[in-house]
């Protein structure tokens, strides 16, 4: 006894509709990834910790007073309590084989007591490479330059203002998109009556990335509050 299975005929119109639906679903899956990559290149690179010291401490830097050369990326007001008169740094964050960021910065404390001064910084971010239909290779990129002024407004209190200009390009021949933002910082620093009064504690506050959109995307604005205790047991050992 033979068994026959009836299969309904699929008209050309239904086949075309099904194909369009598949393409639409594929595009909807790829679109968030594409937009996410654009977001990193245009604005979110500001959230990447550029220096090894802060990255090794889970990205903290709001209340650290001995990282003056990179403090402009975290909280420039802490430079007022640095033991150094001036400093400079350069670092390269090799995020993976496709992403990378160069950063450089310096600071200088003015006057005999160094109660005020300035700092400048630069960051350049390169996104992953992609290929056009003709095989040409390209990638998105973004960079920023910033300058900060810090000052002791009281014996243990310092404030800072950072002005930043950002620019991004989705690809080589795309129009450059620019934006301006500011950071506000504050630090309160006091010595402790232990370890020959060399120990200290600090509280830091920062309102960062307050400004206009970059390439149609909002900047990753944030508010941060942190604290740190410095316990120098010797010249070579500290917590």
Positions of predicted regions on the chain:
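Secreted/luminal cysteine- and crosslink-motif detector
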Residues: 4-7, 30
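Short, Lys/Arg-enriched N-terminal segments with co-localized hydrophobic residues
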Residues: 6-17
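Bacterial N-terminal signal peptides that target proteins for export
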Residues: 16-25
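Bacterial N-terminal signal peptides
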Residues: 26-33
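Subset of outer-membrane beta-barrel
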Residues: 38-239
């Amino acid at each position: 006894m033979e068994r026959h299975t009836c299969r309904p005929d699929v008209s050309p119109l239904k086949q075309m509709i099904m194909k369009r639906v598949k393409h639409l679903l594929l595009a909807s899956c790829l679109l968030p990834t594409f937009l996410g990559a654009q977001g990193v290149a245009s604005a979110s690179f500001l959230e990447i910790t550029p220096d090894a010291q802060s990255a090794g401490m889970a990205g903290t830097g709001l209340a650290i007073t001995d990282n003056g050369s990179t403090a402009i990326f975290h909280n420039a007001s802490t430079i007022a309590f640095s033991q150094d008169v001036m400093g400079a740094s350069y670092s390269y964050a090799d995020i993976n084989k496709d992403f990378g960021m160069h950063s450089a910065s310096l600071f200088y404390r003015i006057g005999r007591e160094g109660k005020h001064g300035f700092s400048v910084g630069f960051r350049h971010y390169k996104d992953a490479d992609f290929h056009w239909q003709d095989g040409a290779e390209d990638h998105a990129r973004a960079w920023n330059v910033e300058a900060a002024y810090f000052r002791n407004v009281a014996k243990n209190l310092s404030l800072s203002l950072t002005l930043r200009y950002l620019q991004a390009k989705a690809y080589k021949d795309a129009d450059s998109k620019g934006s301006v933002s500011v950071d506000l910082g504050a630090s309160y620093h006091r010595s402790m009556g232990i370890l020959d009064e060399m120990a200290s504690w600090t509280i830091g506050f920062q309102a960062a990335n307050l400004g206009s959109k970059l390439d149609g995307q909002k900047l990753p604005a944030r508010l941060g509050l942190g604290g740190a205790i410095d316990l120098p047991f010797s010249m070579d050992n500290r917590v």
